[in-house]
Amino acid sequence: MMDMARAHVFISGRVQGVNFRASARNYAREVGVSGWVRNLEDGRVEAVFEGERSAVQKMVSWCYSGPSHARVEAVDVRWEKPTGEERGFSIIW
């Protein structure tokens, strides 16, 4: 059985208007992680990544840099119990 993980992540810095959500979706699909990503009104980006632990860890690591125009200042990671509810990866508008 696979070792599953779920990370609930909040990314701070210049992370809106820099293609962060689309880049996160593309990378999540590449590494095989399910979940979602959205902008928050306070300027942060929030995301949930669920899947095989090694793939979720790759996504969390990616959040510390993000796409080339992003300037990540902080990443708050909350590890949660996997729910199995996520199907695919989507941008929430």
Swiss-Prot record:
Residues 6-93 form the Acylphosphatase-like domain. Its EC number is 3.6.1.7. GO terms for molecular function: acylphosphatase activity. Keywords: Hydrolase. It catalyses: an acyl phosphate + H2O = a carboxylate + phosphate + H(+). InterPro entries: Acylphosphatase, Acylphosphatase-like_dom, Acylphosphatase-like_dom_sf, Acylphosphatase_CS. PROSITE patterns: ACYLPHOSPHATASE_1, ACYLPHOSPHATASE_2, ACYLPHOSPHATASE_3. The active site is at residues 21, 39. The keyword Hydrolase applies. Belongs to the acylphosphatase family. This is Acylphosphatase. It comes from Roseiflexus sp. (strain RS-1). The lineage of its organism: Bacteria, Bacillati, Chloroflexota, Chloroflexia, Chloroflexales. The gene is acyP.
